[in-house]
A protein has these predicted regions:
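Residue-level signal for pocket-adjacent positions within structured domains
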Residues: 8-9, 65, 146
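Active-site phosphate-binding/coordination module
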Residues: 22-119
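Short hydrophobic/aromatic-rich motifs at helix boundaries and adjacent loops
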Residues: 1, 18-23, 96-100, 132-138
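Gly/Ser/Thr-rich helix-start
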Residues: 12, 65-69, 134
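Conserved acidic, metal-coordinating active-site core of Asp-based
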Residues: 109-151
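Asp-based phosphoryl-transfer active-site loop
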Residues: 2-18
Length: 151
């Protein structure tokens, strides 16, 4: 029987305070040795997940922005399937709507509902870093939203 692991990143493979994955490496390496695919499924953006995929050397499909899209390496499966576009040699199956549409809707809800909040799209990378505890480079990656808005 083929096994596969779907996992979140924040607080699972990544320490929820330091964002370190050091404590997860032994398990990740054991899964790799046993040819068990590790599928990241996270609220993180494609840009954020690509950084961790490179660092951890995990090159399986991954799910971004809480299901906004599934990205697969172009030659991952030996069969064809429907996908919307190709980005950096990744096939993109889009399940969500584009960020600009999400942002318009969030802004409309905010305005018409009289709500007072800011999303990542309303903040600079410096503000995102300050509010989230991310370092500035991570905040820049977190702002590269394609399917969701963090408020």
């Amino acid at each position: 029987m083929k096994q596969i692991i779907f996992t979140d990143l924040d607080g699972t493979l990544l320490d929820s305070v330091t964002y370190s994955y050091e404590k997860s490496l032994a398990g990740i390496n054991r899964l790799k040795q046993n040819d068990i695919p590790i599928i990241f499924c996270s609220a993180k953006t494609r840009a954020e997940q690509e950084l961790y995929r490179r660092k951890m050397k995990v090159f399986h499909p991954f799910i971004v922005e809480n299901g906004g899209a599934i990205l697969l390496p172009s030659n991952y499966f030996p069969f064809s399937f429907g996908y919307r576009r190709i980005v950096d040699e990744l096939l993109v199956i889009e399940l969500g709507i584009p960020y600009n549409e999400v942002k318009k809707l969030v802004d409309k809800i905010k305005e018409e509902g009289g709500f007072h909040f800011r999303g990542f799209g309303d903040m600079s990378a410096e503000e995102v870093a300050k509010e989230s505890g991310l370092d500035i480079e991570s905040a820049k990656l977190a702002k590269q939203r394609e399917y969701s808005e963090t408020v």
